[in-house]
């Protein structure tokens, strides 16, 4: 006899589930049953030996269970805490200059083109498709200063089913490429229009995020007004901080009355428990303490930090100060759109800091796996909704098949002893790519393979 009033189930999976908790950086749950409700939430995750009990409780038949192959596994969707959707148009090229020169020569001219909404639609459609195919179920996007094309990005992410924050970029100081700039009044007015229109559309999983580019491109007035907009509407905030030594020095010269880079944001109401700041390579212990006190987060972007020769973020130091942190691809300063690349680079950067005796230990692959999933969800304030397979959270997940057609991974007899081994999981994280990601789910809905409607 079924229990009364139980909601219908959209999915019941049996197999291996790999996720993180705050006490365990990588937990491998073999031969488990996971149920997803019609609303996309996880309603049970228990050992398969409990099938009979669960079937009675949730009214399902054995034929409704989808059994994974012994080499397949589910892991949480990857969370990209920092990506410039507009820069995808030149990703994989033009990374031969340090940050400030790179912005002037390549980035601002490329972003200027997004006043053309046809061009914007092509680029944004491709970047959302590409990131979803590569397992990014949640993305925190920078768009450009153009409101209409930024709204288009929100529409496209919603259409494809990706969970996202979308930000219209704000900047009123840009002497190096003056064609790509706003007045203070324009920036505030257009941000208010952007936020208002996005909120009116009532997307289920796409939200606006207030986006001052960085302190060098925003006046104090603009930053203060943006902080007020975020406070009024209870919105998230994203920007950049302490990415490159020249940038840090330039901020000091532009804003000499502030204690440091963090103080510029803090005094202008931009450092809150809904703020995520990219990079942070040169933050002092004093600044990290302020991040902790405010509840602000850091997006660690190792590919970009290396590719533009910006610096190394000491993640262990960030964690020591109990600051929330996730990973970001930072396309196109980071040339890869794949969060798997971000995982690999984060491990390498941590190893470099160990080699150089900055730290006495390195981050493990398991710890970085947690940063890319649960850590990223926490950095974006979504850890109550996504990030792992805890009951009550939404089912944001990717199905991994290490033996997929044309897989870049070779598996051997020793990789399997009845159940999937941790070696296979490691091989995917180090060697795998989108060919191994067979299905992607956001909020319980399968979004990859793509439906014919998109």
Swiss-Prot record:
The EC designation for this entry is 3.5.4.3
- What GO terms describe the biological role, i.e. biological process, of this protein? guanine catabolic process
Q: Which CDD domains match?
A: GDEase
GO MF annotation list: guanine deaminase activity; zinc ion binding
Top-level EC class as recorded in UniProt: hydrolase
Keyword annotations: Hydrolase, Metal-binding, Phosphoprotein, Zinc
Q: Which residues bind Zn(2+)?
A: 82, 84, 240, 330
Q: Which Gene3D superfamilies does the entry mention?
A: Metal-dependent hydrolases (3.20.20.140), Urease, subunit C, domain 1 (2.30.40.10)
- Which is one Gene Ontology cellular component term of this protein? cytosol
- The modified positions for Phosphoserine read 453
Cofactors required = Zn(2+)
Task: List the pathway annotation.
Answer: Purine metabolism; guanine degradation; xanthine from guanine: step 1/1
Q: What's its catalytic activity?
A: guanine + H2O + H(+) = xanthine + NH4(+)
Annotated residues that bind substrate are located at 84-87, 213-214, 240-243, 330
Q: SUPFAM superfamilies, from UniProt? A: Metallo-dependent hydrolases (SSF51556)
Q: Which note does the record give on the cofactor?
A: Binds 1 zinc ion per subunit.
Similarity comment text for this entry:
Belongs to the metallo-dependent hydrolases superfamily. ATZ/TRZ family.
Role of this protein? Catalyzes the hydrolytic deamination of guanine, producing xanthine and ammonia.
Subunit structure as annotated in this protein's UniProt entry: Homodimer.
Indicate what this protein is called per its UniProt record.
Guanine deaminase
């Amino acid at each position: 006899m079924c229990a009364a009033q139980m909601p219908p189930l959209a999915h019941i999976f049996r197999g291996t589930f790999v996720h993180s908790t705050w006490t365990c950086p990588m937990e491998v749950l073999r031969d488990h049953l996971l149920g997803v409700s019609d609303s996309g939430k996880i309603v049970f995750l228990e050992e398969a030996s409990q099938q009979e009990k669960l079937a009675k409780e949730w009214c399902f038949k054995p034929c409704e269970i989808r059994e994974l192959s012994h080499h397949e596994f589910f892991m949480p969707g990857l969370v990209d805490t920092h990506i410039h959707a507009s820069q995808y148009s030149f990703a994989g090229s033009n990374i031969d200059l340090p940050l400030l020169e790179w912005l002037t020569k390549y980035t601002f001219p490329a972003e200027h083109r997004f006043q053309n909404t046809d061009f914007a639609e092509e680029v944004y459609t491709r970047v959302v498709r590409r990131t979803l195919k590569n397992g990014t179920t949640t993305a925190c996007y920078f768009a450009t200063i153009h409101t209409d094309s930024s709204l288009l990005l929100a529409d496209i992410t919603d259409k494809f089913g990706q969970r996202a924050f979308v930000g219209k970029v704000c900047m009123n100081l840009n002497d190096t490429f003056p064609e790509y700039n706003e007045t203070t009044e324009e920036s505030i007015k257009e941000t208010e229009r952007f936020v208002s229109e996005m909120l009116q559309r009532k997307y289920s999983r796409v939200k606006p995020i207030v986006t001052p580019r960085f302190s060098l491109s925003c006046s104090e007035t603009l930053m203060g007004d943006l902080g007020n907009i975020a406070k009024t509407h209870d919105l998230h905030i994203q920007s950049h901080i302490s990415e490159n030594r020249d940038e840090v020095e330039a901020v000091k010269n532009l804003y000499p009355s502030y204690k440091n880079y963090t103080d510029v944001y803090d005094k202008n109401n931009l450092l809150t428990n809904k703020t995520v700041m990219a990079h942070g390579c040169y933050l002092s212990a004093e600044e990290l303490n302020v991040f902790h006190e405010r509840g602000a987060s850091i997006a660690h972007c190792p590919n970009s930090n290396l590719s533009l020769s910006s610096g190394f973020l000491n993640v262990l130091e960030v964690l020591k100060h109990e600051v929330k942190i996730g990973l970001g691809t930072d396309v196109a300063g980071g040339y890869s759109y794949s969060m798997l690349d971000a995982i690999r680079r984060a491990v390498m950067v941590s190893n470099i800091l160990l080699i150089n005796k900055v730290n006495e230990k390195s981050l493990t692959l398991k710890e970085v796996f947690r940063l890319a999933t649960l850590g990223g969800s926490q950095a974006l304030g979504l850890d109550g909704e996504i990030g792992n397979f805890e009951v009550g959270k939404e089912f944001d997940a990717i199905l991994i098949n290490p033996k997929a057609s044309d897989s870049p991974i070779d598996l051997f007899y020793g990789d399997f002893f009845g159940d999937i081994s941790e070696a296979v999981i490691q091989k995917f994280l180090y060697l795998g790519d989108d060919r191994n990601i067979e299905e992607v789910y956001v909020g319980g809905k399968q979004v990859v393979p793509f439906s014919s409607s998109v």
